[in-house]
UniProtKB/Swiss-Prot annotation:
CDD domains per record: UdpNAET (cd01555)
Protein name: UDP-N-acetylglucosamine 1-carboxyvinyltransferase
Gene Ontology MF, one: UDP-N-acetylglucosamine 1-carboxyvinyltransferase activity
Positions of modified residues (2-(S-cysteinyl)pyruvic acid O-phosphothioketal): C117
Single GO BP term: peptidoglycan biosynthetic process
HAMAP family, A to Z: MurA
NCBIfam families named in the record: murA, PRK09369.1
Job description of the protein: Cell wall formation. Adds enolpyruvyl to UDP-N-acetylglucosamine.
Predominant localisation class: cytoplasm
Similarity comment: family membership: Belongs to the EPSP synthase family. MurA subfamily.
Pathway: Cell wall biogenesis; peptidoglycan biosynthesis
Keyword presence, Transit peptide: no
Catalytic residue positions: C117 (proton donor)
Length: 423
């Protein structure tokens, strides 16, 4: 199992290209199952979750062609199976996203209940009740969601809670339903807008994506298309925090400041100078970060996927802060690991009080989920001495070549590969 070894060594400096968004690429890949022709996706990041999704699409029968560095063409015409098996689905939450497309396009689907980051119970009731409202018969048996419908029928659905992948699944399913579907209380994340753009390029008729009411006029079929996925706002935010924590000066390219306004506001509150261009963000930090309170909530509020990174920054900030996690009930697993590095954090329920310390000290720590892992990398960048992070397979789910990108900015970080599995 690979590990990361870091030594805190001062400010990050330089330029970096941001990858395409994992959480946009995954639904777009699932959406290819809806088409009658090949769909080409560009700006796809090299990540373990993407590889898993491509394996899943191949298992269903789709022909997957990886062209060049960042392009992937999926030909859904040879799809012959509607079963998404446990072995593939267990590692990745987003695999539930094939449910809506398979059902809408093939009339049935069997998808193992998904895994993913262990940050809470993460039910899929919003997905299932929405598909039922569209006319599907759904049962959950032997760990599989089994769904059937000759043709879905458009209807008005008020989602019981704001769910990102729930909105995406219903949006995809509704594109091929008969008549109009109105999704109310929809999630407004940029990745949903991106998915709607991809589906529209395939011939879907969608309005309102990015607002809480999305209208979809069902069509008989979707055709081939080409779509480039949005930049990864969470990767962007993670590198911005890295620069802020190390007192650095970096410029991120091929990103979009409009996707992470709440994060940029918090960085400015912490004392960073942030300058944005058409597809660039430059951050300069000339002081010790000021502690900032953070409260996670659905977009456009502060993202839960940036909570752990800001907690890491608050650990070395001037003053105290309160970090409140309102989305997931178990997303403070980084607290005990940050404490091993000398952080002063008191977590109780959904709130953590962080008192900034002058310095962290390196220690062996364990990654527990994707963004928790990122927070440990950030802490390792400023800790005195060596930080050794174990179980970084979580990190590989969501960050493309993180050690190469940070090294290019001057960080002392290297991957220690161990071919012997310690399971
Ligand atoms: C692949 C992907 O895009 N993952 C993102 C997506 O996850 P995901 O789509 O799984 O997250 P949701 O938006 O569905 O979850 C939000 C909250 O609603 C709850 N809930 C959700 C569905 C449901 O049927 N019942 C229910 O109770 C969840 O347990 C959670 O407490 O959005 C999260 C919230 O921004 C992000 O952290 C994840 O990175
Ligand atoms: C929680 C995340 O991923 P997933 O929903 O795929 O588990 C994430 O991207 O931070």
């Amino acid at each position: 199992m690979d590990k990361l070894l870091l030594r805190g060594n001062g400010p990050l400096r330089g330029e970096l290209r941001i990858s395409g968004a994992k959480n946009a690429a995954l639904p777009c890949l699932a959406a290819t199952l809806l088409a009658r022709e090949p769909v080409r996706l560009c700006n796809i990041p090299h990540l373990r979750d993407i590889t898993t999704t491509l394996e899943l699409l191949s298992t269903l029968g789709a022909r997957v062609l990886v062209d060049g560095q960042l392009g992937i063409e999926v030909d859904p015409r040879p799809v012959h199976s509607v079963v998404a098996p446990y072995e593939l689905v267990k590692t990745m939450r987003a695999s539930i996203l094939v449910l809506g497309p398979l059902l809408a396009r093939h009339g049935s689907a069997e998808v193992s209940l998904p895994g993913g980051c262990a940050i809470g119970s993460r039910p899929v009731s919003v997905h299932l009740s929405g598909l039922q409202a569209l006319g599907a018969e759904i049962t959950v048996e032997d760990g599989f969601v089994k769904a059937q419908a000759a043709r879905l029928r458009g209807t008005r659905i008020v989602m019981e809670m704001v769910s990102v992948t729930g909105t995406e699944n219903l949006l995809m399913a509704a594109t091929l339903a008969e008549g109009r579907t109105i999704l109310e209380n929809a999630a407004r994340e940029p990745e949903i807008v991106d998915l709607a753009r991809c589906l529209s390029a395939m011939g879907a008729r969608i309005s309102g994506a990015g607002t809480s009411v999305i209208e979809i006029e069902g069509v008989a079929e979707l055709h081939g298309a080409e779509h480039s996925v949005v930049p990864d706002r969470i990767e962007t935010g993670t590198y911005l925090v890295a620069a802020a924590m190390t007192g650095g000066d970096i410029c991120l390219k091929r990103t979009d400041a409009g996707l992470l306004e709440s994060v940029l506001l918090k960085l400015k509150e912490a004392g960073a100078e942030v300058t944005t261009g058409a597809d660039t963000i430059r951050i300069r930090m000339k002081r010790r970060p000021r502690a900032v309170d953070v409260r996670t909530a659905p977009f456009p509020a502060f993202p839960t996927d940036m909570q752990a990174q800001f907690m890491a920054m608050n650990c070395i900030a001037e003053g105290s802060s309160v970090v409140t996690e309102t989305i997931f009930e178990n997303r403070f697993m980084h607290v005990s690991e940050l404490q091993r590095l000398g952080a002063d954090i008191n977590a109780d329920g959904k709130t953590a009080v962080v008192r900034g310390v002058q310095r962290l000290r390196g220690a062996p720590v364990m990654a527990t989920d994707l963004r928790a892992s990122a927070s440990l990398v950030l802490a390792g960048l400023v800790a005195e001495g060596e930080t050794l992070i174990d179980r970084i397979y979580h990190l590989d789910r969501g960050y493309e070549v993180i050690e190469e990108k940070l090294s290019a900015l001057g960080a002392d970080i290297r991957r220690i590969s161990n071919t012997r599995s310690v399971a």
